[in-house]
């Protein structure tokens, strides 16, 4: 090969490898022979100018011949001369003064256009010269022939246009633009097949280098740096681009080789590393030509990023998934050496037999129930292995590839932690659980060839709460991760291409990324189901106790996670409401000075904790809507109200009704008395202060009666819910050991004995009390015969209602206290009933129905009765457990009497129940109910000692008739309850709780028939009396 007659030069990596890592210079004959072979036909070559040429140096030549004469169309003189062999000589140079001349004003970025192939096959982007005096078809024909595309089967589109271009247009007009190539309708298959056939004929064999290492990666850095400098150095000088790219006026360029008409961005031969290296060098070479157009440069960079991403992903498919980037392996000193060992250890540790029968000898002799138990245990193990492998797919495929792409400058805008949360931490968690808990169970079975014991899992599942704490964060961020992923798939083309490639990987098993991100939540909720399946098929008591303990631990943690998620959602909803409230304009100042001091306090923080409740509880928005409000005698105004758990906000819309401002002070729910009005759809709210005095009255008008009913009911529910939250906080402060959620560390202490673990699941949360619709007004309380389900407090034997005192309820006015007994349970035994007056214990409707309402009774209904102040309970008393709230119906069957009572009169019944037939004078046939109550409880005036012996009972001062003697004075009543501390506590709570929200006291009845006789309730007496009256009436009618 004679370099003196060289006419072509090739800078391709393969050609440089043949020429000692330097450009390959060839004559025309050698070039045609060499580059027509299969492996080298796609190389880009450039023409070498002959000696003494007036042309500028070629972009890829290492030297330039000396100038023979000054050229007028060039901008600057050359700085040296070369000999015929291309060697530079720097001796004897003269520095001549440059002659001023007109600068070149052509835009280099307009002399090429980018050709993008919008086909279903991967074809590299081409940069094609926009030649003058040549049509678009003539310029594109060599490119399409090399790609195997028929020019007549495709359409060319300009940028984002949908109108095909004519191939007769002049190519020069499209310089600096972006052209898209799409197959014509009906010819897609033929075009794709032609491209594939062309690729199969021109694809070279991969070099047998170690592990597919690219050719250029083995070149020493110094040589690569010199080669890149050789390419870039000529490009820094301005040249006549039209002559350089092949204008017809240039001699020797009339019949250029077809491959010299286009400049491919990347080579299609060689390995992926060689392709990427050539692509980067080509992009660097042409960056100087297109730098003057910012928009074109940005678009070119976007296209280049997509090509880089496709090249990277293709390399991952060919040579395997990459490792985690080094900067993230801060926990290892020599991560490169340890990673392979760690991966092999994980693979060996996850080894599992095909069936549990391979572990056990003599499985044919097992009973059917034992086989079912082993299958349930095996399902727990097998699903754990499958889940760990799913997590590894997320970390090794999705996350690791994303981080490596970001190391290469791709997808840097994607936040990996926001997309995957703490999934790597979950993967480490489950690998630890598998190796420390489940592998020992398998190894024991493999060693002993015995059955898999479910109790062996207790060590790990007893610590479930502390071990699985990372799940709290993931479950709370899962929804955000899903939303972030959907937004990226919608807006980011590079991310969409990356996810599509990853989802098609064989490790994904046709699962989507969204399905993979939902696996942790699904696995957490599946543990109780798997353990319960094992429990149902286990007969050994000790094993069942251990499994119940594990189920309890898992369910407590899941309940805790649900609570955290619910509170987070409530906080987000509350933040949305706060953003809609614009200002707090409740008080107006009289002058500027007052406004200055007032401004500091004109704010309302709805995100602050609710007073009197646990800080963990979040204020909830229960109801919102538009109402018409009237305050005093003012005219009605349109308002927008927000009802929260503890307060009611009255606001008014501003401007476009998108935001509101607070116009009235917040109304505390526990200081509100609600009453419905006669006007349909209207209700009244009376705001009380700390002294239980009215400070404001607001009338609200809803658009319909149903909406008014909804506001009233929701307000009652808010009051009940708030009171319950405060009761829970006070009970938690006095009895912290009885809370539903105790500290996970205390419950899951490794040193605690298995026998001390509770075998039951966590108690369900108490039902929220709801005020009955029949108790909206104190004058219209529910009768004893109501069959609706009511919430009540059940007190175990020996327990008392010693929970902290409640504040006086919003509905507890003096008129409401008179009807307090009507809301108590009708099945409460007499010995534990709260103290009520005779009028309170009487049904007005019942007395009037049978004509037994005496004038004295009417006076009793109208006259208020003094309330006996209870004696404070001594502080030395031991704290009592908090009551449990249950739902029970207020209907109970009557206790069986020892002897059948047939046609007994009311007087005989009273004598039988009291047991004093001789000491009491025969009563009148139509005795009032209050007298019946007193005769049943005591035949005469009760002394202090009798009250102490009888324990807590009914206290009926002022209701005795003339024949029973004078009523007990207040001084006589007080000593009688000194020993009855629990009863006093219950009475105090009854008076302090609002009407309709008082829990029902339901102690366990004492055994024995005599106890049943002594503890007949007043409601039972009502029913007995009613039955006897009906029997007597029917008997009289028959006679």
From Swiss-Prot:
PROSITE patterns on file: DH_2, PH_DOMAIN
Stored InterPro entries: DBL_dom_sf, DH_dom, PH-like_dom_sf, PH_domain, PKHG5/7, SOS1_NGEF_PH, Ubiquitin-like_domsf
Biased composition (Low complexity): 259-277
Compositionally biased intervals (Basic and acidic residues): 185-199, 217-228
Superkingdom per UniProt: Eukaryota
Sequence positions bearing Phosphothreonine: 760, 876
CDD domains reported in the protein's UniProt record: PH_PLEKHG5_G6, RBD_PLEKHG5, RhoGEF
SMART domains: PH (SM00233), RhoGEF (SM00325)
Expression sites by tissue: Selectively expressed in cortical and hippocampal neurons with prominent expression in the cell bodies and dendrites. Weakly expressed in rat fad pad ECs (RFPECs).
DH domain boundaries: 372-564
Positions of the UniProt region annotated as Disordered: 58-105, 185-277, 739-785, 800-836, 967-989
Presence of keyword Membrane: yes
Subunit structure: Interacts with GIPC1/synectin and RHOA.
Known role: Functions as a guanine exchange factor (GEF) for RAB26 and thus regulates autophagy of synaptic vesicles in axon terminal of motoneurons. Involved in the control of neuronal cell differentiation. Plays a role in angiogenesis through regulation of endothelial cells chemotaxis. Also affects the migration, adhesion, and matrix/bone degradation in macrophages and osteoclasts.
Protein name: Pleckstrin homology domain-containing family G member 5
